């Protein structure tokens, strides 16, 4: 084999090895986005990494969407991943990155939404829960007022404070408060 061809081949092999190695290393060093949930109605728990750096895991997103299904009907809707990013950032901002988030309400079908409205629960007609863009939560050991204030400071969507019911609503719609 001529020297030029051999040296070009060796250079190519080294280049490929370096590229593969750096791609693998880059992925493995990306920060994992992890969420831990406890659903207050289904009594199910979920501990899941749904994102590495800027790459979402489609299987993990599907598992979380199923977990946050309408507990009255069993219907599942694909959640807006910005909700998960908001929850992740909220746990970091309250200084509890490994906190288990109590889910009071996730996705709601139109039927469940109307059921709650007709029973005087103060539910919005066009609730973002029906678009899988909202979630009602609390974090054990963190006051709901602190959770509310922290969510408001993030300016990432709507924040509703339900002190009497001990939960906070967060969504990824327009920034507003109630």
Which positions does each model-derived feature cover?
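Active-site acidic/histidine clusters and adjacent loop/turn architecture
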Residues: 52-104
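Catalytic cores and adjacent binding grooves of peptidoglycan-active enzymes
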Residues: 33-38, 122-178
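Boundary at the C-terminal end of the N-terminal hydrophobic targeting segment
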Residues: 22-28
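Bacterial N-terminal signal peptides
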Residues: 8-19
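N-terminal secretory signal peptides that target proteins for export/translocation
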Residues: 1-4
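Charged, often glycine-rich, active-site loop that binds/positions anionic groups
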Residues: 111-125
